[in-house]
């Protein structure tokens, strides 16, 4: 019966434990060039004891951004700066993969030099653009032309190639949370009538072609996919949740991907879900289909959403996951692995600094040794 502290072979990557650092947008890259900074070097180095670090979502193209100060991987300058991050993580004994990202319609012309966001179909998402003040509604995106889709695939390939140059251990494709690949997948956002729309075989085509191009660069054992079968981010929805995600899991399994991750836990009384601002939220589709997807995929399965140490151990023991990813717990606890191992108290996260820029709430959370030393000298 595996535990969080047992090793795991994740495709070609050997993990010393099953405690994964989930991808976390923190808005600490440079605002203009979207280049990783020295702060990010320190941040990821501090968390290198994770079995695997999955980087924050990183845009493969300037047309794929939708938030301030998030990093990219399309330019030489970005790639060179990511080298500093991977070098620091590896020197600290860690492993790290890059999450490849295109936000699709979840953007705004203010991030795109006045251009409309691109999407499978011209379907406007409900709600406001994240972190923009005053509150600003999303706009209706433009539908990608059929002959533009090859360009999108090429952008993901460039991101995968640059991730290799930057020294990552693999790539993690962002197919979740209502971003571009998820928008193509689900029938509420994909209303196309060509070979990228209609039946699931067509709607999943782009996601699978992106997987194939990343495999061509890295080999299947160093590529993973991130899915969100709860469909509760950014105004998403599909008429056949189980059928849609089952098809994708089966197809990814046929390709022998190194791992699959799903932002979906079994919701129970102990589950504490919060949104990206740290506010409590209700879950849609409380019944998990993760175990079904895990079986259909057939490879290592990472679960993520509202897990505690206890619920994560239970998920592993029951065979519902092979590893568990933690997000906000890693924000506040750079030494989360050690704290779990010692059953030590956890730092509380500060929601006000999630996206605020600067050191505060980013690289200044105390490590356990610091806490213990302070306690020892207290009168």
PLM region spans:
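Flavin-dependent oxidoreductase catalytic cores
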Residues: 1-379
């Amino acid at each position: 019966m595996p535990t969080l502290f047992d090793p795991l072979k994740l495709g070609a990557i050997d993990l010393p434990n099953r405690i994964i650092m989930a991808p976390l947008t923190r808005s600490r890259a440079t605002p203009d060039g979207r280049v990783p900074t020295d702060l990010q070097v320190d941040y990821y180095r501090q968390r290198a004891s994770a079995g695997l670090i999955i980087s924050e979502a990183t845009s493969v193209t300037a047309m794929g951004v939708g938030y301030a100060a998030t990093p990219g991987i399309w330019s030489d300058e970005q790639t060179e700066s990511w080298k500093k991050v991977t070098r620091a993580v590896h020197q600290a004994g860690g492993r790290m993969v890059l999450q490849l990202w295109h936000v699709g319609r979840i953007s705004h012309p203010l991030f795109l030099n006045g251009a409309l966001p691109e999407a499978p179909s011209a379907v406007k998402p409900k709600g406001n653009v994240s972190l923009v003040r005053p509150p600003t509604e999303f706009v209706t995106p433009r539908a990608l032309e059929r002959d533009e889709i090859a360009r999108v695939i090429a952008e993901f390939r460039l991101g995968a190639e640059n991730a290799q140059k930057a020294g990552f251990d693999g790539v993690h494709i962002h197919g979740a949370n209502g971003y571009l690949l998820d928008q193509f997948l689900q029938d509420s956002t994909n209303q196309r009538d060509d070979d990228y729309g209609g039946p699931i075989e067509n709607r999943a085509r782009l996601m699978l072609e992106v997987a194939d191009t990343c495999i061509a660069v890295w080999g299947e054992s160093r590529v993973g996919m991130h899915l969100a079968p709860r469909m509760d981010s950014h105004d998403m929805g599909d008429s056949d949740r189980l059928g849609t995600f089952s098809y994708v899991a089966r197809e990814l399994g046929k390709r022998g991907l190194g791992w699959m991750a799903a932002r979906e836990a079994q919701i129970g009384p102990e589950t504490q879900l919060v949104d990206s601002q740290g506010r409590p939220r209700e879950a849609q589709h409380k019944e998990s289909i993760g175990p079904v997807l895990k079986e259909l995929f057939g490879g290592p399965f990472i679960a993520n959403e509202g897990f505690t140490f206890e619920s994560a151990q239970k998920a592993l023991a029951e065979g519902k996951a092979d590893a568990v990813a933690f997000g906000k717990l890693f924000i506040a606890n750079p030494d989360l692995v050690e704290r779990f191992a010692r059953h030590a108290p956890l730092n509380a996260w500060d929601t006000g600094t999630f996206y605020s820029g600067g050191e505060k709430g980013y690289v200044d959370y105390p490590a356990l040794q610091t806490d213990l030393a302070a306690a020892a000298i207290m009168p």
